[in-house]
Swiss-Prot record:
Taxonomic lineage of the native organism: Eukaryota, Metazoa, Chordata, Craniata, Vertebrata
Function: Transcriptional activator which regulates endothelin-1 gene expression in endothelial cells. Binds to the consensus sequence 5'-AGATAG-3'.
Biased composition (Low complexity): 183-201
Renumbered residue ranges of the record's region Disordered: 166-208, 457-480
Protein's UniProt name: Endothelial transcription factor GATA-2
Assembly and interaction partners: Interacts with BRD3. Interacts with AR and CCAR1. Interacts with MDFIC.
Pfam families with a match to the protein in the record: GATA
UniProt subcellular location: Nucleus
Length: 480
């Protein structure tokens, strides 16, 4: 449906003609706002009707605007609905319904544009001439417009929680705490009963949601501010709003020492902290307080365990065990070891006449025999024949049992590990981490998660990543 340029385009909007939105919902559309001198420019009126049509049927005169509208449809579907009709915003003291027509429509258009200015998915305005004009009725930044500064600022501040909450899944930066906007009872009472009844239920539901969000946000900010890890977060909500495409992002704060309450998340904890905090503490043997003790039996001054005899005197571990088992003092002179059976002088086998054997045995008559002859006789009850005699002693390689193998292998592994720990420097020393943790100081102090604790940064960052402070406009471009 084509409309003449001089005719107001919003007069022929199909939503109004088909009575999808009754006049009682927007009383300003059916009364004294028909004069062309009081109407807004066509571009701003398109924006106004874009938020009126919640069914997704906006009116645009040319296909270029329609294609641009399609790109905003997913985010528009999340932001339309109940939040577009808030009586306490539209009936604020600076924006009455029944006063001048331009102020009311400006507030509605600014009400529509405010989610895009605070959403992380923000793009350039659909109508640059309307949104970018300095001092015009529509302004991207709160309080920048000349005539409706208070109204646009309040609408932007009231919609900040919803927009920031919708984008919190992708950007974990905590949003700026919203300003509480309470409806003015005098101006609200002066409004038409039809409009207040139409949007009253929606406004009450949204007020409850807004109060819940503000309470939860304040509690989370208190928790983060009181945490020893991030004491600097308590002052984040008081930062002034900057003129920026994404005002929910806080201003750039360098990673200073006061932002980190614990050395675990501060780069200085890795770089300048003592290396002993990461090195395994070698347990030094605790010196016992018994340096002056001495064993009354052998005179030893060092022993793994001090014992006492019957009279209370100190004994070393060896003398104490001997006294306990034998009931007498441990002899100081070691007894001479008995010569092994293989070295007995003058002993020979009664069967094969050999003088060397690993073990001397005795036959039934009591005569000494070598190990081979004694075993043969024990098994066969017959003397071992002399033809089986060999010059050398045949021995066999006994296989170690599995238990002894495991114990020996475990001991060897433990020794190797202890040697490696002593020889090599610890892997988490300050010198080893100095090269890897250098770019951490350029990172913003906020993590990309919604939790209280920040996400630990990787120790080995990729060389392709840029650790400079990213400009939010480039991030929005990448999102698009």
């Amino acid at each position: 449906m084509e409309v003449a340029p001089e005719q107001p385009r919003w007069m022929a909007h199909p939503a109004v003609l088909n009575a999808q939105h009754p006049d009682s919902h927007h009383p300003g559309l059916a009364h004294n706002y028909m004069e062309p001198a009081q109407l807004l420019p066509p571009d701003e009126v398109d924006v106004f009707f874009n938020h009126l049509d919640s069914q997704g049927n906006p009116y645009y005169a040319n296909p270029a605007h329609a294609r641009a509208r399609v790109s905003y449809s997913p985010a528009h579907a999340r932001l339309t609905g109940g939040q577009m009709c808030r009586p306490h915003l539209l009936h604020s003291p600076g924006l009455p319904w029944l006063d001048g027509g331009k102020a009311a429509l400006s507030a509605a258009a600014a009400h529509h544009h405010s989610p895009w200015t605070v959403s992380p998915f923000s793009k350039t305005p659909l109508h640059p001439s309307a949104a970018g004009a300095p001092g015009g009725p529509l302004s991207v930044y709160p309080g920048a417009a000349g005539g409706s500064g208070g109204g646009s600022g309040s609408s932007v501040a009231s919609l900040t929680p919803t927009a920031a909450h919708s984008g919190s899944h992708l950007f974990g930066f905590p949003p700026t705490p919203p300003k509480e906007v309470s409806p003015d009872p005098s101006t609200t009472g002066a409004a038409s009963p039809a409009s207040s009844s139409a949007g009253g239920s929606v406004a009450r539901g949204e007020d409850k949601d807004g109060v819940k969000y503000q309470v939860s946000l304040s509690e989370s900010m208190k928790m983060e501010g009181g945490s020893p890890l991030r004491p600097g977060l308590a002052t984040m909500g008081t930062q002034p709003a900057t003129h920026h495409p994404i005002p929910t992002y806080p201003s750039y704060v360098p990673a200073a020492a006061h932002d980190y309450g614990s050395s675990l998340f501060h780069p200085g904890g890795f770089l300048g902290g003592p290396a002993s905090s990461f090195t395994p503490k070698q347990r030094s043997k605790a010196r016992s307080c018994s340096e002056g003790r001495e064993c009354v039996n052998c005179g030893a001054t060092a022993t793994p365990l001090w014992r006492r005899d019957g009279t209370g005197h100190y004994l070393c571990n060896a003398c104490g065990l001997y006294h306990k088992m034998n009931g007498q003092n441990r002899p100081l002179i070691k007894p001479k070891r008995r010569l092994s059976a293989a070295r007995r002088a003058g002993t020979c086998c009664a069967n094969c006449q050999t003088t060397t054997t690993t073990l001397w045995r005795r036959n039934a008559n009591g005569d000494p025999v070598c190990n081979a002859c004694g075993l043969y006789y024990k098994l066969h009850n017959v003397n071992r024949p002399l033809t089986m005699k060999k010059e050398g002693i045949q021995t066999r390689n006994r296989k170690m049992s599995s238990k002894s193998k495991k114990s020996k292998k475990g001991a060897e592994c433990f020794e190797e590990l202890s040697k490696c720990m002593q020889e090599k420097s610890p892997p988490f020393s300050a010198a080893a981490l100095a090269g890897h943790m250098a770019p951490v100081g350029h990172l913003p102090p906020f993590s990309h998660s919604g939790h209280i604790l920040p996400t630990p940064t990787p120790i080995h960052p990729s060389s392709s990543l840029s650790f400079g402070h990213p400009h939010p406009s480039s991030m929005v471009t990448a999102m698009g």
